[in-house]
Amino acid sequence: MLVIFLGILGLLASQVSSQLVGQLRPTEDPPEEELEYWCAYMESCQFCWDCQDGTCINKIDGSAIYKNEYVKACLVSRWLDKCMYDLDKGIYHTMNCSQPWSWNPYKYFRKEWKKDEL
């Protein structure tokens, strides 16, 4: 019985730790431990990429793209269970942090980098 209880408690603890909690003031530089979360639902945010010499490497999965209109400066913030992306010029996205969904108005600008294209 104790083993079952501890197993359930461990399962609940792992679910709680994966959810974002607390307030996050608007920032272009979210905490490192939250980067995977924010980049999963709005991949074109500039903080998700390391860009140099016209090529950008994704900080989460290592994919490479050409730097263009796809990579945008983003402000992210969190208040209670609302996670928000602000892309400036009236483009923003709000979602429940506990029930996130992907959103990317710039997906058509993404151009994969290929090693043989120089």
From Swiss-Prot:
<dbReference type="GO" id="GO:0044166">
    <property type="term" value="C:host cell endoplasmic reticulum lumen"/>
</dbReference>
<keyword id="KW-1038">Host endoplasmic reticulum</keyword>
<dbReference type="Pfam" id="PF01639">
    <property type="entry name" value="v110"/>
</dbReference>
<feature type="signal peptide">
    <location>
        <begin position="1"/>
        <end position="18"/>
    </location>
</feature>
<protein>
    <recommendedName>
        <fullName>Protein MGF 110-6L</fullName>
    </recommendedName>
</protein>
<keyword id="KW-0325">Glycoprotein</keyword>
<comment type="function">
    <text>Plays a role in virus cell tropism, and may be required for efficient virus replication in macrophages.</text>
</comment>
<keyword id="KW-0732">Signal</keyword>
<dbReference type="InterPro" id="IPR004848">
    <property type="entry name" value="ASFV_fam_110"/>
</dbReference>
<feature type="glycosylation site" description="N-linked (GlcNAc...) asparagine; by host">
    <location>
        <position position="96"/>
    </location>
</feature>
<keyword id="KW-0244">Early protein</keyword>
<comment type="similarity">
    <text>Belongs to the asfivirus MGF 110 family.</text>
</comment>
<feature type="short sequence motif" description="Prevents secretion from ER">
    <location>
        <begin position="115"/>
        <end position="118"/>
    </location>
</feature>
